[in-house]
Amino acid sequence: MEFIISFLPAFGIVALFFVFWKNSWVSKQPVGDEKMSNIAKNIAEGAMSFLKAEYKILSVFVVAVAVLLVFKGNSEEGSNSMVAVSFVVGAICSALAGFIGMKVATKANVRTTNAARSSLAKALEVAFAGGSVMGLGVVGLGVLGLSSLFMIYSSMEWGTNIEMVLNVLSGFSLGASSIALFARVGGGIYTKAADV
């Protein structure tokens, strides 16, 4: 069991290598004419501006919740303040996955449109490659983050208590889910405003 767990971070790294490989492949696809390129550039700039503004606000939320988790971990019996570390790592992994997804989505959109001019099969290939970057980015960061934290916590003095380790690791899910929720709601509002 321990042998398998020690290899888990490597699987996360392999997934991230695949992400960067597919991202570079999508980037090499032709963008199209100047009008398409300009529209794509404006969409990408708007999306990244939104993401920066959203992440600034979310960083305040993450710090505030982490402080509360430290306080709760130190004041309640059977709890551990390290859950705050798991929360922050989960939030960072989720935010990084969102950043990667936004970058590749804005790249893949225009390239898929351009590929559709020549063939539907080529457009599907570009679109699928763009989607796989986001999917494997989430998986790679999740596996890397969780398995690394598990190995670190297991080596601590309280690491022999598997129930405590799993309770502390639950902070990772809370951090990742919190960022994903805010990104989903905020992104929906942003795209609706852009439509209007």
Which residues are covered by each model-predicted region?
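Hydrophobic, small-residue-rich transmembrane alpha-helices and their short perimembrane loops
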Residues: 1-196
